[in-house]
Amino acid sequence: MSSSFSSSCFDVEVTEKVAHIRLNRPDDLNSMVREFWTELPEIVRGLDAQGDVRAIVVSSTGRHFCAGMDLGVFTSGDTAITPGDSHEMGRVRARLRQTALMLQESFTAFERVRMPVLVAIQGGCIGGAVDM
């Protein structure tokens, strides 16, 4: 039996008890945008909860595996650091810490699953992609 679904950053397919998670933003070198960091742990935890998946393989589409983090993660949304924040450095640092913890939690999802996770890398693997 086979099942599949897609998100803004990933295509996921489960075939013969193997889940294949593909980074699918080749035009942007599969860079890790804000959605990447929320979608990845949700996908991994969901596969773990299914109970029938025995292994996860992570790969990508395009010439390169991943160009690393899109630095826009630090300049948009709740974690944005703006020039007006300079007088409140404590708050800036607290937001930065929360962002770093959220980013780390995304990769920690791989450690918490009950099955092995393999990563197939082709082309460039830069920055945060090396940590994955």
What are these regions (language model features)?
Residues 1-61:
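Conserved CoA-thioester-binding segment of acyl-CoA-metabolizing enzymes
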Residues 24, 69, 122:
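Histidine-centered beta-alpha loop that forms part of the nucleotide-sugar donor binding/catalytic region
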Residues 35-36, 70-75, 132:
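Short, glycine/charged-enriched secondary-structure capping and boundary segments
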Residues 60-105:
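Glycine- (often His-adjacent) and acidic-residue-rich active-site loop
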Residues 102-132:
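Glycine-rich beta-to-alpha active-site loop
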